Amino acid sequence: MSDEIEIDTDDLERRMKGAMESLRHEFASLRTGRASASMVEPIMVDAYGSPTPINQIGTVNVPEPRMVTINIWDKGLVGKAEKAIRESGLGINPQLNGTIIMLPIPELNEERRRELTRVAAQYAEHARVAIRNVRRDGMDQIKKAKSSGMSEDDQKFWEGAVQELTDKMIASVDQALEAKQAEIMQV
């Protein structure tokens, strides 16, 4: 293996892990019937003239398995936060208690559970595509290096390394999807 031509597999791995992290974030936003502070992370509230994440205008807590509470720090933003939650598409009806917004998480019916597993599968497929795109970029780097004088043995080595990394990341996507689907279908 020649020292002068090397493929940056660390960069490829970092980009693939970024796709995996994005998948974890998308999975966290799925409402599975269990309360979690990450459910409300994507909700933006029109606060002080600009969209602000709800967790930056109040404290998000999970006091019970089926309850999320948000203690809004500024009384003037309680109504806007409640409106943002209603319009978020979470399907949760917020209840007000002073500056505290309570979000009771209802049980999911079978149809909704199946729908959420399909959504989770779509998220996983997007992550797989992103990982394959990174793989393609790596293979393109190898082709450029081959035209710059990389030996055929080195080319095979780097192609194998990139493919091995891709297979490992795709397997972790599949594993995360299995775990998420099991969590969603659990009654």
Swiss-Prot record:
GO terms for cellular component: cytosol. It comes from the Bacteria. One of its GO terms (molecular function) is ribosomal large subunit binding. Keywords: Cytoplasm, Protein biosynthesis. GO terms for biological process: cytoplasmic translational termination. It is found in: Cytoplasm. InterPro entries: Ribosome_recyc_fac, Ribosome_recyc_fac_dom, RRF_sf. Belongs to the RRF family. Responsible for the release of ribosomes from messenger RNA at the termination of protein biosynthesis. May increase the efficiency of translation by recycling ribosomes from one round of translation to another. NCBIfam families: frr. This is Ribosome-recycling factor. It comes from Paracoccus denitrificans (strain Pd 1222). The gene is frr.
